[in-house]
Amino acid sequence: TTGSGKSVAIHNIIISLLFRNSPEQLRFVLVDPKLVELTLYNGIPHLLTPVITDSKKVILALKWAIKEMERRLEILRDHKVQNISSYHEKVYRPAKEKFEAAGSLPEDASGVPEPLPYIVIMIDELADLMSIYPKELESCIVRLAQKSRAAGIHLILSTQRPSVNVITGTIKANIPTRIALQVASQIDSRTILDQAGAEKLLGRG
């Protein structure tokens, strides 16, 4: 619902992640179909690409993320680790420390495993995009949601209109973590949380 604090919540999540992580540790893909909410982050070093405002480019960005997820999962498999935190702890960090302790030159770093920063894909106002590319968008979101966490790729989706046309059953089944701010009706609350309650919130985030 308008005025519920969604934009404030999104900015707080982004700022908290920026404060805690360097560009080497975390990268963002920000999608802002409304043009005014996330474009203020253009130019920060954490962005993998300028803030995406063109709906056509959103599908391309998500397809890139799927390929990157699959590439990373192959790297994890080759190094016999289960997720990206284990990769950093057992593979990348020890190799980097050994390289630095040896006083090697940067051009000799070819033997050091590739650093894999976390990637956060944040889509503001999913409803606008779902009205244009419902099937393609749902397919990309579900593929990422199913396997991307181990690869260090995370999705944050937001919408003012939590209808079943936007938060489809398939998307909902694959995104277990949800936050509901104030909504207009009990039906909207049930769409997000599977229970009533969000319609009784004060509307201040």
Q: Where in the sequence are the language-model features?
A:
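P-loop NTPase switch/communication element
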Residues: 11, 18-63, 170-171
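Hydrophobic alpha-helical scaffolding
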Residues: 3, 51-55, 62, 134, ...
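The conserved Walker
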Residues: 1-3, 159
